Swiss-Prot record:
It comes from the Bacteria. One of its GO terms (molecular function) is ATP binding. It catalyses: 7-carboxy-7-deazaguanine + NH4(+) + ATP = 7-cyano-7-deazaguanine + ADP + phosphate + H2O + H(+). GO terms for biological process: queuosine biosynthetic process. Transmembrane segments: none annotated. This is 7-cyano-7-deazaguanine synthase. The lineage of its organism: Bacteria, Pseudomonadati, Thermodesulfobacteriota, Desulfuromonadia, Geobacterales. Signal peptide: none annotated.
């Protein structure tokens, strides 16, 4: 019998790869996505279309409005930076977002009787978000086992799986391709056009393009400002 696992699934490149890995490792994946007022909701639409074809047993979309909190270019009128990937934590950071997401995942996991949670965080080719670091994940896992009925009663130990955390974006892409992931059915851009095209200039687009260039594979998604993503990604490094 396959073990159940909750997989945080945004519809982006990393989380799609993470879902494929969970399934390949023999888990029954229960995908969880969020509609939280994000400006790049086209990513969520990809998640809705692809969760079950990707092998998810169930797909739960949690709805809440992070715009009430604000403080991020993804949930307010703050402009999304287009100058390149910097060294400081960017304004696209959503305050405590992974803590909120993982808490929802933990709650669902406890209800399902699942003790495994997958999240596609990465600490190499990323924008410097503090809630993507290994020490954060370790701290949340410890908290999960202290803060739940299942944890304190010893019914099992919750584990937070981060299979991408020490991989480069190119390595993530190669891994996904080896598992049959169709990256043309993913979305990464923080600031897409009204038609849903990726901008090609935000942090997320730049990291994605760089990853495909280093993997030696053309990015299959359409960009509003780039005619040849493979060439553009090499030039932007």
């Amino acid at each position: 019998m396959h073990k159940k696992a909750v997989v945080l699934y945004s519809g982006g490149l990393d989380s799609t790869t993470c879902l494929a890995i969970a399934r390949a490792e023999g888990y029954e994946p229960y995908a969880m996505s969020f509609s939280y007022g994000q400006r790049h909701s086209v990513e969520l639409e990809q998640a809705k279309r692809n969760a079950r074809p990707m092998g998810a047993v169930d797909h739960l979309v949690v709805e809440f409005d992070y715009r009430q909190v604000g403080g991020s270019a993804l949930t307010s009128d703050i402009a999304v930076p287009k100058e390149g990937v910097g060294s400081d934590i960017p304004v696209t950071y959503v305050p405590a977002r992974n803590t909120v997401f993982l808490s929802f995942a933990l709650g669902w996991a406890e209800v399902l009787g699942a003790f495994d949670i997958f999240i596609g965080v990465n600490a190499l080719d990323y924008s410097g978000y503090p809630d993507c670091r290994p020490e954060y994940i370790a701290a949340f896992e410890a908290m999960a086992n202290l803060a739940t009925k299942a944890g304190v009663e010893g019914k099992g130990r919750f584990r937070i799986h981060t299979p991408l955390i020490h991989l480069t974006k190119a390595e993530i892409i190669r891994k996904g391709l080896s598992l049959g992931v169709d990256y043309g059915r993913t979305h990464s851009c923080y600031d897409p056009t009204p038609e849903g095209l990726a901008c090609g200039l935000c942090d997320s687009c730049r990291l994605r393009l760089k990853g495909f260039a280093e993997a030696g594979v053309a990015d299959p998604v359409a960009y509003a400002t780039i005619k040849n993503p493979e060439v553009r990604s090499q030039e932007s490094e």
